[in-house]
Amino acid sequence: TYLCENCDVLSIHCYQPADEMQRFIDLMKTFNRPIFCTEYLARPFGSTFETVMPVLKKEKVAAYDFGLVKGAMQCHYEWNKVDADGNKIPFTEEPELWFHDILHPDGTPYNAAEVEFIKSMTKK
């Protein structure tokens, strides 16, 4: 509470579906500070552009996505994937559902419909 009451801007991360994002934003709004969501995309967790961006836009929360182009950081892989015993599961193939990232290294979209949705949400 002290930190939120004494900072100029609130920077949040939320990798949850839209309803959880809304609850988190509602809580942060009680501090009457501008809110920046600096990480939110986690497709396997239900946090997608299509579900979360409308909430962010409605609440006037500034936001940007952590990943852009699939590359050396391998943000298209889900982090902390572990088995029932807590052992890290290595990735042996390309994930069907990317975690972060929007574009392939050649600039083509991972999901063209998703890119069109992003464009539609960012128009004035």
Regions found by a protein language model. Give the residues of each.
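Substrate-binding clefts and catalytic carboxylate motifs of secreted carbohydrate-active enzymes
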Residues: 1-124
